[in-house]
Structure formats: C-alpha cells, structure tokens
UniProtKB/Swiss-Prot annotation:
Residues 31-47, 204-263 are lumenal. The chain crosses the membrane at residues 10-30, 48-68, 126-146, 147-167, 183-203. This is Palmitoyltransferase ZDHHC22. It comes from Rattus norvegicus. Its EC number is 2.3.1.225.
Amino acid sequence: MLALRLLNVVAPAYFLCISLVTFVLQLFLFLPSMREDPTATPLFSPAVLHGALFLFLSANALGNYILVVQNSPDDLGACQGTSSQRPQRPPPSTHFCRVCARVTLRHDHHCFFTGNCIGSRNMRNFILFCLYTSLACLYSMVAGVAYISAVLSISFAHPLAFLTLLPTSISQFFSGAVLGSDMFVILMLYLWFAVGLACAGFCCHQLLLILRGQTRYQVRKGVAVRARPWRKNLQEVFGKRWLLGLLVPMFNVGTESSKQQDK
C-alpha cells in the first residue's frame, strides 16, 4: 500500500515534468528553428501555425487533466454513513479504491498519473485527456524529428532510420560528434513516441468499453451489464454537447451518467 501511495505522488509529478520539458523544447528549440524560413509570410509562417496547433493540443490535454482531478467521483461510503435512512445495496459497478480510500459509482480504474479514480463524473475528461496527450506527444515527436533532421543533417526517408537513430546517436555522443542538447531531444523523441502510442491505445480501449456500456472493473469481475444501444452509451459519457467538449475543456454537463444505477 505504501508503494501505491508513493506511486500516486510520483506519477503526477512525472507527467507535469514531461509537460514542462516539452513546452520548453517547443518554445526555445523547435519554434526558433522554424522562423528561419525567409520565404514564409509572417501570418502563415510555419512557426505561427506550429505554435498555434501545439498550444491547442496542450491546452486541451492540460485542461482535461485538471478537470479529471477536480471532478473526482463522489464517495458513496461517506454519503451512506451520514444518511439516516437504511443503506441500500450498492450497484454492481461500485468499488472501494484502496488508494483513494472511498467507494465510487461506476468505478473504472485508478489512474496514477492523475492521482485520482476514474468514474462516471470524469470519464469523458479522462478520455479527452488521453486523446490530446497522445496527439500532443506524436506531434512533438514529428517536430523533433524535423529539428534533428535539420541540425544533424539526417534523412528519415528510410523506414529503419528512426529505429537506428538512438544507438547511432549514443555512439556519436560519447565520441563528441553530437551535442548534449541534441542527444536530449533524441531521447525525448522516443519518450514522446512511447507515451503517444500508450495514450492512444488506452483511449481506444476506453471507447470500446463505453460502446459496450462496460467499465474495466465490470470486465475484470465478470459483471453482466444490460444490453443498450451504443449511441445511448456514448451520450451518457460525452453528453449532448460532445462537440463543444471536444474543442474546449469543460465539465461534463447534461449527462445522466452520474445518476445511472446498474440493474
């Protein structure tokens, strides 16, 4: 339990550090290298377009991250403890989280990177957080590849060029041919690639469970759920204003997921 609580503190700090490092690299390395194009117009220069797109992806990723933390699931155990009525039988999807020490409705899993449980209240923000984190990481990787290609005069036309970049760069770094800053960017390329793929896979997995009307806890425990139309399952999680929530981080308003009780 001590290890889990320690991980619950280290993982959010790790995510925030990676986000800060990514922002610094974009601001002080990638964007200045794009301003050197004299043929581009000031309004539609690559630096302006790249900066606007990166800020959009980062703002949505961090905004939904904050909403996941703020909109933590309600503690049903505390509500039943303060109620004077006879406690009802909890729905099959409720679960007691040992890390958070509370009972949550439609518990899916505990996310250590947010330090919070994922349930009915913050599921949509969690999925959008995974989506935009994946896009921001993969986009940063593409920008980093362009930067390394220009600085080190490396061609990535060959399919295996990215796979052989790390071992080749390590040997050149110890021989003095590659600077420490460039080596750090190369290491970040692989980190962005790994985090981007992991978040994309997790986002797709969560969407598949939502289409089926299930949670990870229900799948793990073998709890049977009532068959419902997939569109209704999506609406309960994303609400009627799903398009606005896709563009701007916002609280999941207008859904019935927090009021749903499993049969």
